[in-house]
Amino acid sequence: MRKFREKAETLFDQGAGLVIRFRFVVVLLSIVGALMLASNIRNLQFDTSNEGFLRSDDPILTTYNEFREQFGRDDMLLLAIHSDNIFSLKFLERLRALHENIENEIPNINDMISLINARSTRGEGDVLLVDDLLSEFPETEEQLEKLRSRVMSNPLYQNQLISVDGLYTTLVIESNVYTETGDDDLFSGFEDSGGSHDAVSDNGLSSGKFISDTENSEFVEAVYEVVGKYQSDDFQIYIAGSPAVMHSIKLFMQSDVKKFLRIAILVIGFCLLVMFRRVSGVILPLIVVAVSVASTLGLMAFLGVSFKLPTTILPSFLLAVGVGASVHVLSLTYQGLRRGQQKDLAIRNAYSHSGLAIVMTSLTTAAGLASFSLAGVAPIADLGIFSSIGVMISLWFTLTLLPALLA
């Protein structure tokens, strides 16, 4: 065991000497490699969907996809619109404009329903009549009152399209099951001759690829943009439903990642400053862990792995875990400098004494984190895989980039 340790110390001493000798090449290659990986971060996707918590081969996900193929999406976007006088010409005209604006300008809509295109089913004698509720748009007070009576007396509308007190009405939007991206324009010459109730896309013209979380966010953002044009004191619009909730969670995730990173950098930087009382003692470890985090996230994006709720802790976690190795090296290096050693010798001695401990600590940490890759919940498995990879990337830059920068 002693011989092994002595050989390891010699190996780390020689390795540090080699890095110091070719430090400019090492720094250049490290920067190029990190930039190549980090350049993919712009393609990193945030996934807040329920399906994102399941593995691609999970039987539950397979069953759910079969359900969506047959019955469509089971989550809706709901607009609740408040007014003291819903059955007024001004309100109904604005509701119609909102309905048509959403229908014509927003992508990925499969179906939508409101008072504007609702079906009216009623019996007259022995005859069952089915037509549009607003087949004839009301223009007089008498027609408006008749419409109000029909709507408020119909149990199929109550708490569906109109509240019991008549102060709220809804506009329900169902997005496509399949993505519209990349669809061939095979059906562009055919137009739907049906009424407004059916004048929507045919479930995305089944491309075989389910609508993505990114397209869901674009869909929700487009709805918010249109709603903003109609929002007023006498036309108050509230948005609810799973797509809106998932979009809000995504925004919170993006905000939280940035916030946690800033807090982690400030806290770690402050601790390093108190510990070393040197600018280099603060800047160099932060450079190493920042490059490691950027490379890890870039690798995630390159491999097409989405950022999910549990993985939001990954950047901050890697910052906290990765900085420890740099602290060991810097502490021993500065001790050597205080004893009067030359910088190159102090760096080599630091790696000779701490190199094996740093490697073993990183390996055991990575192995422990990798055990999460066996988890049944996909984001937990992703967290285990990429946190272990991130620890090893951090180790690599600690052994190569850090001594090159120190020299």
Model region roles, listed by residue range:
Residues 1-48, 178, 208-407:
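Membrane-embedded transmembrane helical bundles of large multi-pass transporters/channels
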Residues 41-86, 92, 138-161:
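Solvent-exposed, non-transmembrane loop/terminal regulatory segments of multi-pass membrane proteins
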Residues 54, 81-90, 173-181, 203-214, ...:
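Structural beta->alpha junctions
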Residues 55, 62, 72-76, 107, 109-207, 248-251, ...:
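Extracytoplasmic
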Residues 61-64, 92-99, 220, 224, ...:
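Extracytoplasmic/secreted envelope proteins and their assembly/folding machinery
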Residues 76-80, 113, 170-174, 238-240, ...:
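Soluble periplasmic/extracytoplasmic beta-strand elements of cell-envelope proteins
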Residues 80-82, 96-122:
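Short amphipathic beta-strand/extended segments in non-transmembrane regions
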